[in-house]
Amino acid sequence: MRGGSIANAAPWNYRYLAASYILSRNNSYIGRNVNMRIAQVAPLTEAVPPKLYGGTERVVAYLTDALVELGHDVTLFASGDSLTKADLHASWPRAVRLDPAVTDHFVPLFMQLEMVARRAHEFDVIHAHLDYFGYPMLLRLPIPSLTTLHGRLDLPELPALYGVYDGVPVVSISNAQRFPLPQPNYIATVQHGLPKDLLDKGPGSGGYLAFLGRISPEKAPDAAIRIAASAGMRLKIAAKVDKVDQEYYRTTIEPLLSRGDVEFIGEIGEHQKSEFLGNAAALLFPIAWREPFGLVMIEAMACGTPVIAYNNGSVPEVLEDGVTGFIVENERQAVDAVGKIGALDRDRIRAEFDRRFTAHHMAQNYLKLYARLTKAGRTGKRSNGHANVGESLLT
């Protein structure tokens, strides 16, 4: 792990960073191949990868390791309990969610941003995963940068914010994610990916349907319970319950768990997913909101397991109806789809995952963006990506 104490570092100076960046870029491509020096800036909420649930940090982990495997020089700014193939710069000793000493989450965040800024001249590109928290810094650095938007974009304050930060290059994780917020400077859509050998294809012979992820109204596990019951199938639920959703769990979900055909397993880790998903006849994904991506869908595909999902958010971009699962509009159609899952080819489903959703595929798409941004930087113009608005990298 490299990096220094923030207490011993001098305050960062933008003109100094600009000069250092120009010198380092002039030297960095002499006698070198196209390998890049990349900073990945992860949220500090969870470790990278997280011990259990945590979609953003998992994607950052997969992307970072894939970039290293492809031969690039990557530094990961994350919590000190992270595990990575890259150089780790510990921005805080451990995941903030697990640190009882942290009462103000902005303190670790501001320290992390300071560390990134002081080392910015070492990199060809900075890739942030902090949503809008990094924008004031990124706009003022002379280093090409981009930010992947991992969360929901329907918050009422965001249009005003992106009226101010309209030049920050951002990447959506699905085209559907952009719908409530068209203002940002979208330079591409890059879908998530998983390591090819992370999950194994299973036989689907367990005689149950699966629900995986988080207990919350927008994920609608209550709908999954009703669908499974109407289809005459057992349902296994592997999910976490956040504090904010405990009342929903207590009043809506817990009373349904007394049924003999529903089993609540709780939160599971990465090593348990192959068995859980691989033995399931199908994954139920009856979402009640515009899901930005839905990582559990491609986890199921990696296990060869079809997905029955509501036609909402990113679902039509991820699933191919009648091939990798069924896209439905309501519970009745979902029940009908359960009766058709035997017609789907689990080998074909896994093959579609290999073709579209591996971590290396995701990394190659991001490398195209890094190269475009750094090329613009080498011409003496700091790219804001406007020429590429709306481009999609979904291949």
Outline where the language-model segments fall.
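Catalytic cores of nucleotide-sugar-dependent glycosyltransferases that transfer UDP/GDP/TDP-activated
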Residues: 15, 21-395
